Amino acid sequence: SPQEALTHWRRKWGLYRTFLDGPTLKDFEQTPDVPVEPKVVFQTRVWSEKEVGPDNHLAVNSLRVEVMRRLRAELGDQFVGGLVPTAYAREHYPDVLSSAPARRQKFIRWSKRYLVGVYVRGLNYSYGFRFAEHLAASQCVVAHPEGFRNPAPVQPQEGVHYLPFATPEECVKQCKRVLDDTELAQAMRNANYQYYQQQVAPAAHLWNCLERGREYYASL
């Protein structure tokens, strides 16, 4: 019917707009010599049980929320971010909601202004998008080790590309360490920019995939 056709194309247009209005590669990228504010950024989502598939939504959410609460309490104005204010987050975790931009392009431009990014695992122990975003922006990273459970072709190195934490308290400690040590911070920014350029940037990633494929078939 005409009404069904109209509904169909409205949905299609909404999908197209998502890509047309979304961030470009230049929005993500930033060299390590660009000045940034000495603050810690951590903004992410929480999920309901039906949204996470085989993962445990309570385990995913609790780590994120407890880290945010501790960072807010200990760092004060040096912490920015919080939970994206979805209906689920507003109902279950109203004390850690973020007022910062949530739409992709505005969020990316906003979040890369800060020195340190906190990273936790994605759903089902995947690499979260946030880690690549921090690398592209030449930010320092404080990361939970579960975020690296699945190995990358070239694994990020602890102490070089990120500082690890196991508890919310340790996350605060590691963030303060970076904020207080300008030499450490600059070295990590440089290392993460280099890692991004060599392993994560789309052209480099595609080239590495082709090279590994060539090496594999040459070995047959």
Where are these regions (language model features)?
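Catalytic binding pocket for nucleotide-activated donors in carbohydrate/polymer assembly enzymes
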Residues: 93-98, 107-220
